Amino acid sequence: DVATLAHELGHAVHSMLASEHSIFTQNPSLPLAETASVFGEMLVTDRLLAGESDPLLRRELLVNALDDVYATVMRQAYFVLFEIQAHRAILEGKSPEGLNELYLQNLQEQFEDSLDLSDEFAYEWLTIPHIYSTPFYCYAYSFGQLLVLSLYRRYQHEGDAFKPGYIRLLSHGGSARPRQILSETDIDMNDPDFWQGGFEVIRGMIEELEGLGL
């Protein structure tokens, strides 16, 4: 669909801008690899919302966007929290059933009383390949999505003035550490206000969805 096209075109633009570097440093590091792709999806969602007055369709667009945010920011972060707990539990001699209990507690903490979770969900962690093949990998999804949301918040405030710095960010590819690349575009990874901007984008989508009253 159009969102997938925007996502993949984002990767293409990122690669083109970074192509001046050697083959060893063209590809962005994991935390920045999804920057242009997810940013492209955000642009498409905003454009569709701007041209849509039907409340039902607006709700669908917002729900899809928020689903993606949850799946990429919260869910992936909780995978890593579970991994930390699981590795400690294994060192303490916990059985597989004990790991299942930890995972179910992990889900219950996420959803509290908003969802009824059946006992079968305790086995879900067994279906997540990253846990076996690339341990502690999933943090990068959370980092990348929240980075894009925070960048998008800045774009909303700055408009055209945002573009040169963003292009400069993508042009680095993987030629430097993420902290250095971001600092050269006036982004301080240690600044809570920058990251809070991403949560403000989420808040805005939730408030609009609630305001539709459907």
Give the residues covered by each predicted segment.
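Short, structured coil/loop segments at alpha-helix boundaries
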Residues: 1, 22, 53-58, 191-192, ...
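Non-transmembrane, amphipathic alpha-helical segments
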Residues: 1, 25, 65-66, 136, ...
